[in-house]
Amino acid sequence: MTNAGIDLQLGFETALQNLGLGAGAAHALWMPLPMLLLIIAATLGVMVMTWLERKISAAAQQRIGPNMAGPQGVLIPIADGIKLLTKEDVLPILADPVLFTLGPILVFLPVFLCYLVVPFGQNLLISNIAIGVFFLIAISSVQPIGLLMSGYGSNNKYSLLGGLRAAAQSISYELPLALSVLAVVLMSNGLDTVGIVEQQSGLGILSWNVWRQPIGFVIFLISALAETERIPFDLPEAEEELVAGYQTEYSGMKFALFYLGSYANLLLASLIAAVLYLGGWSFVVPVETIAALAGIPLDNPFLQIGAAALGIVMTMVKAFIFIFLAILLRWTLPRVRIDQLLDLGWKFLLPVSFVNLLLTAALKLAFPTFFGG
């Protein structure tokens, strides 16, 4: 089922205007809602991910894991949140107060802004803009600035080294990640995230980009792991070398921003992978085929509501496959050295991503039916 997607902002403001409100008042009422929705959804997602992290790590190490705070330890994320909220927010004497405060904000904010253009389900996204993929890449590139500010503003040698490592790592892996995404954009003939999902919905699982972009898919996964600073790419906060890297001097809510931003970034990368390569909300079997077999017309409202609800579930299931893989890799792989990390990004992934992009362009010209000509 390929619909163009609904702009929630336009629908919300139009409904309020139909009730008699002016355009300015309707827009003013809309403005805080997306950020509120993002904060609530991301917080819930982070809570689930932190619980999964503890349980999967416990299973990998043959432990029980959290089991005291609620059944199976499901309330442990709430306990973590209360602990961070009640901790003192310390500002080191020799730290730069402006940079020290702005750093966590610039790390935290771009991640949440990127959620504005990620479609969570059929016709469910906050802003359906035509340059959604470009917006994702552009906004996410702001994050290294916050990492550098945090490291430099802390006036700590470990923080500075961690900030420099984080910026170098982020810049090194942004390029292959962007080139792998560009290959998908080339096949989809547009930067619209909804359009990319619709381009994969024709034949169900056979239409997913993962089959036409296996090299780009692997490059995206490796680069996304490096961008989210997960083991084996957690060089910026290597405990044995740098205490906690650029986070060393942080506590309380400022540290909570790093903590929340890290897991929200992993969830974002997983959602983008699901949208770009696994068909987003698309089912394994197309909805049209299911409706035809069941004898249900496509314009049936119950079918549309059910497909939309299941589409949200499909998107989250695909995203959590990547999250499970990232958590499992954290507890099974050793950390790479900084020279190995940079060599992998610049000497291997970047050239391969260039070749993959050129190969995609050639295949699109040779086989336009299969590669979006």
UniProtKB/Swiss-Prot annotation:
Family membership: Belongs to the complex I subunit 1 family.
EC number: 7.1.1.-
GO cellular component: plasma membrane-derived thylakoid membrane
Record gene name: ndhA
GO biological process, one term: aerobic respiration
Protein topology in the membrane: Multi-pass membrane protein
Catalysed reaction, written as an equation: a plastoquinone + NADH + (n+1) H(+)(in) = a plastoquinol + NAD(+) + n H(+)(out); a plastoquinone + NADPH + (n+1) H(+)(in) = a plastoquinol + NADP(+) + n H(+)(out)
Transmembrane stretches, start-end: 29-49, 98-118, 129-149, 177-197, 202-222, 267-287, 309-329, 348-368
HAMAP family cross-referenced by the UniProt entry: NDH1_NuoH (MF_01350)
Protein name listed in UniProt: NAD(P)H-quinone oxidoreductase subunit 1
GO molecular function: NADH dehydrogenase activity; oxidoreductase activity, acting on NAD(P)H, quinone or similar compound as acceptor; quinone binding
Native source species: Synechococcus sp. (strain JA-2-3B'a(2-13)) (Cyanobacteria bacterium Yellowstone B-Prime)
